[in-house]
From Swiss-Prot:
Cited NCBIfam families: sensory_box
Ranges for region Disordered: 450-612
PAS domain boundaries: 85-156, 271-341
Assembly and interaction partners: Efficient DNA binding requires dimerization with another bHLH protein. Heterodimer with ahr, trh or sim.
Protein name stated in the entry: Aryl hydrocarbon receptor nuclear translocator homolog
Length: 642
């Protein structure tokens, strides 16, 4: 019995010894893995303590990264053999559009900076070397940079809280240093931009990139640029790492011997470029609206147009700022923007400015869609000043009512309605037969269907037929012309003829211009008159030659009148009967001719020189060989008739 008890005790003791040995072995393994976890930066960066397998896997990956496995050649070199260290460094910095700098972690003193800082920040290499990095950082970013350079705990140095067990563990200074050594650092900060002459810079790409990410002058007048810095916390670099730059260590820096080796690159921000078209346009602003019309974003340029600040509009309904007469159709337009997803709409309306006046705005609106859900997130509106509408200025203070707007639009539209049926040669070009040129002298107006009034028909019956007075080279219908401005052109009815019209001598216009301004005008005999609404077009006056049959077969054009062809045949005894002195009907409105001081018979000026003698003086000008209109360079419609 006693022997059995003794054997049981020995067996139990040996079992306890084995368990103790296993427990000590497991504790040692855990300690080594924990120490390995402290040495691997990726493990220490995790929020929770990883398991042993994760620690071992991250440790292997970190060792491969340190050895450069897979990134080196067979001889272990990190660069091509034909490149020196300096050439490789310049190539890397040029490709990265950045600069290399080394900063002491404790003091923040710049112990090295590459010469590529000049095209990036407009500072020379000597401007940065030996200075504090915090002097080149925006004041609001200095605390963040100080945290990035710190390698020790600020208050609880050497004391680490284990979140899993809830206990506080004491760690030595070496453990904290091991935690920081090799740690990657990456941050974005605002760095000061210097005043180096840009003409000395070689890279134009960096200048454009600097304009893209420049934040502009701050309150103190200093320009800042957004710089993205990436690097590692390292021990003090050996003296041969930067052979061209001498680096001295302060006495205070001997305690930590760590520094930040980083590359600074310009960070492209969402700030609009200065050279981009429309980005600095002060006559437009951008707004963003919710689906109910509330302002969720307002560009600060709204102050220049409406007088509001963005904070005065945020959260308010946009319909409250529209003109009461525009609110209904603006709501319908916004509904269409929401229904037609992504389609651009152009709107014109009146918005109330801060001074209670209504300003015309032209808005291009579209709905922004969520790319994942394909649902409308918000409405984006680009609002521009609507001071120009149909090419004419709009006065916001004068055009408040729809009646005024409609009247103003009608004035802007080119609508020309003739008082009598006829053709107005003022808009469309008509090239005479045989003419090689097509200038502004021969223009015809756009025609529109319009029935003649009874008074106009009576006047037309008193006038000679168009078939008798049409010059050679043109053929018109003998019926009354039912056309006026605004309708289709009758050019299809004009057949070509082989006879070239004969122009009037150009000197006759300039010589008789003073007489044109003093005398009254005669009415048009063929029912073709000019439009009087536009000063650029010819006013009413003699369009065709008003002739008189004097001495039987002799016919002449009055000076200053335009005749497009030779005179009509002599066998037309009745075409000038109304101009004869005795016993014949007079024209409907007998007035003095604008080019002659002699009035027609029956006119207010009385009888003058016989018509045959007047026209015989001009016959010699019409007997020459017919020529084209290329020699006639006088614009007959440019003379201002009174």
């Amino acid at each position: 019995m006693d022997e059995a008890n003794i054997q049981d005790k020995e067996r139990f003791a040996s079992r306890e010894n084995h368990c103790e040995i296993e427990r000590r072995r497991r504790n040692k393994m855990t300690a080594y893995i924990t120490e390995l976890s402290d040495m691997v930066p990726t493990c220490s960066a995790l929020a929770r303590k990883p398991d042993k397998l994760t620690i071992l896997r991250m440790a292997v990956a970190h060792m491969k990264a340190l050895r450069g496995t897979g990134n080196t050649s067979s001889d272990g070199t990190y660069k091509p053999s034909f490149l020196t260290d300096q050439e490789l460094k310049h190539l890397i910095l040029e490709a990265a559009d950045g600069f290399l700098f080394v900063v002491s972690c404790d003091s923040g003193r710049v112990i090295y900076v590459s010469d590529s800082v000049t095209p990036v920040l407009n500072y020379t290499q000597s401007d940065w070397y030996g200075t504090s990095l915090y002097e080149h950082i925006h004041p609001d970013d200095r605390e963040k940079i100080r945290e990035q350079l710190s390698t020790q705990e600020s208050q609880n140095a050497g004391r680490i809280l284990d979140l899993k067990s809830g206990t506080v563990k004491k760690e030595g200074h070496q453990s904290s240093m091991r935690l920081s050594m090799g740690a990657r650092r990456g941050f974005i900060c605002r760095m000061r931009v210097g005043n180096v002459n840009p003409e000395s810079m070689v890279s134009g790409h960096l200048n454009r990139l600097k304009q893209r990410n420049s934040l502009g002058p701050s309150r103190d007048g200093t320009n800042y640029a957004v710089v993205h810095c990436t690097g590692y916390i390292k021990n003090w670099p050996p003296t041969d790492m930067f052979p061209n730059m001498h680096m001295e260590r302060d006495v205070d820096d001997m305690s930590s011997h760590c520094c930040l080796v980083a590359i600074g690159r310009l960070q492209v921000t969402s700030t609009a470029a200065n050279d981009m078209s429309g980005s600095n346009n002060q006559s437009e602003f951008i707004t963003r609206h919710a689906m109910d019309g509330k302002f969720t974003f307002v560009d600060q340029r709204v102050l220049n147009i409406l007088g509001y600040t963005p904070t005065e509009l945020l959260g308010k309904i946009c319909y409250d700022f529209f003109h009461p007469e525009d609110q209904s159709h603006m709501k319908e337009s916004f509904d269409q923007v929401l229904k037609q997803k992504g389609q651009m709409f152009s709107l014109l309306y009146r918005a109330r400015a801060k001074n209670s006046e209504y300003v015309w705005l032209r808005t291009q609106a579209y709905a922004f869609l969520n790319p994942y859900t394909d649902e409308v997130e918000y409405i984006v509106c680009t609002n521009s000043s609507g001071k120009t509408m149909h090419g004419a200025p709009l006065d916001a203070a004068a055009a408040h009512t729809p009646e005024q707007v409609q009247q103003q639009q009608q004035q802007e539209q080119h609508v020309y309605v003739q008082a009598a049926p006829g053709v107005d040669y003022a808009r469309r070009e008509l090239t005479p037969v045989g003419s090689a040129t097509n200038d502004g002298m021969y223009q015809t107006h756009m025609l529109a269907m319009q029935a003649p009034t009874p008074q106009q028909q009576q006047q037309q019956q008193q006038r000679p037929g168009s078939a008798q007075t049409t010059p050679v080279g043109y053929t018109y219908d003998t019926t009354h012309s039912p056309y006026s401005a605004g309708g289709p052109s009758p050019l299809a009815k004009i057949p070509k003829s082989g006879t070239s019209p004969t122009p009037v001598a150009p000197n006759s216009w300039a010589a008789l211009r003073p007489q044109q301004q003093q005398q009254q005008q005669q009415p048009v005999t063929e029912g073709y008159q000019y439009q009087q609404t536009s000063p650029a077009r010819s006013p009413s006056g003699p369009t065709y030659t008003q002739l008189s049959a004097g001495n039987g077969n002799r016919q002449q054009a009055q000076p200053g009148a335009y005749q497009a062809g030779p005179p009509p045949p002599p066998n037309a005894p009745g075409m000038w009967d109304w101009q004869q002195a005795g016993g014949h009907p007079h024209p409907p409105h007998p007035t003095a001719h604008p080019h002659h001081p002699h009035a027609h018979p029956g006119g207010p000026a009385g009888a003058g020189q016989p018509q045959g003698q007047e026209f015989s003086d001009m016959l010699q000008m019409l007997d020459h060989t017919p020529t084209t209109f290329e020699d006639l360079n006088i614009n007959m419609f440019s003379t201002p008739f009174e």
